[in-house]
Design a protein with these regions (language model features):
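Catalytic cores of Mg2+-dependent Asp-rich isoprenoid enzymes
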Residues: 2-22, 34-146
Length: 146
């Protein structure tokens, strides 16, 4: 995608990797329940072990203290990827700059929703409302926020 925007240097690719990784991670956390139902688990095994949260608990959609700590850790790591990728937008022009900012901000907003739900992504999939999307787009176009 960077090539379509005219960016071909290694630094732009590095920044894009951070942004794309963050967006993919948000999607994983947002879709834990639906992915489990499809036989997919994207939580790293080492992190499950570190926080003593089992796949059996995951299969039941159990949100306990260990799960919240695990997801707090994953959310913090995801935010770091977003933060490291944010300078990419400043390297781009026009619609490309807006697109990257919009996607990054959208991902960060979904991550906010995951956190506000106490990391309980099993009862309700965190998504932006139509109003939330409109507000996000307006803020991005007007340059309000990060």
């Amino acid at each position: 995608m960077l090539y379509a925007f005219g960016e071909r240097d290694a630094e732009a690719r590095r920044l894009a990797d951070f942004t794309c990784t963050a967006l993919q991670l948000v999607n994983f956390w947002q879709d834990l329940a639906t992915d489990w139902a499809k036989g997919r688990v994207y939580l790293p095994q080492e992190d499950l072990r570190r926080f003593a949260y089992t796949e059996e608990e995951l299969s039941r959609g159990e949100v306990n203290g260990r799960f919240r700590e695990l997801m707090r850790f994953e959310a913090a790591r995801t935010r770091e990827f977003f933060d490291r990728g944010l300078p990419l937008a400043d390297r781009l022009r026009g619609a490309a700059r807006l697109d990257v900012r919009l996607f990054s901000r959208g991902g960060m907003r979904v991550l906010d929703l995951v956190e506000r739900a106490g990391y309980d992504v099993f009862r309700r999939r965190p998504t932006l409302s139509k109003l939330g999307k409109a507000r996000l787009a307006l803020e991005t176009v007007l340059g309000i926020g990060p």
